[in-house]
């Protein structure tokens, strides 16, 4: 079954359990960064939490180690080089840890919008990246995408309209509660 994708375009709240360590009452199994239990700022903690959040699950099999190793980990998820909503995008990095982020939007020209966090950097930020290699600079090397188990529908997709012949009344198939749902 398909689900309408809910984009994250702002930082998660400090109380969002997807970004709080399990030992502090949250759902996240990644390394704790802040004394309050937050796993942010860290790309691994963010991507792990966001992947679970978007699918409304409390745990997943994604790696919790170096982001540069995520793409080649045998975790049971499908992979590829074509972006999908909610997918984890993975990069390795020359001489250091890689980076992971989440695909929040795919534009008609092939560009993608990602949501991110960075270890010792920003708690939350967005990037627009260009195909085919979705470059983050010369030291990062695009590996591919780890796909979510959920088949997401883009919230910008036009909504089908059904017109009944007798009444000429248009019935709109509308998922308002999903489109207007705010993520904390």
Please name every model-derived segment.
Residues 6-7, 106-171, 175, 184:
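Aromatic- and glycine-rich peptidoglycan recognition patches
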